[in-house]
Amino acid sequence: MKRFIYVCAFFLCLCSCSESKYIAEELERTQEIINDYPDSALHSLQAIVPGSIRKKSTKAHYGLLYSLALDKTGQTIDTDSMLRPAVNYFMRKGTNRQKFLSWYCLGRMEYSTNNYQKATESYLKALEYRDIIDDPYLIGVCNFVLGELNLKQNKLSKGFVLLSRSLRKLSGCK
């Protein structure tokens, strides 16, 4: 009986490791297509059961990609239940691009829930990485939304400065 339990435990560990590897590989494939095929990326992410993800790094990667896919398909990010852990994880162990994107997505979510002050803070935290990530499009979009947020909060001069900064960044994009 003891041997049977050990064998079952071994196979359970083996299966969970392979599932983890499969999910990580699927997330890598999804990351490669998310900009060109956001609908397909979202569909791929929806096929993954978030509760089956065990590793913190994989959960963070999934939460960020899922939020990006929702944003890129024009859907609202209405909760930070997957995004907040991603922000926390990437602030400790992520690349500068992951840090930028996680703050950016959090800002999108806060903006969509009309929490303009929090959204402004998140976008400003994202822009702390602007010189490091060197992505004029993302930086331009971030400045554009910040400009819009300032206009909504009646900070007109700051809003126009950010909007003009956004236009300069976006004019260099293809």
Language model region names:
Residues K2, Y6-C8, C17-K174:
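A "functional boundary" signal
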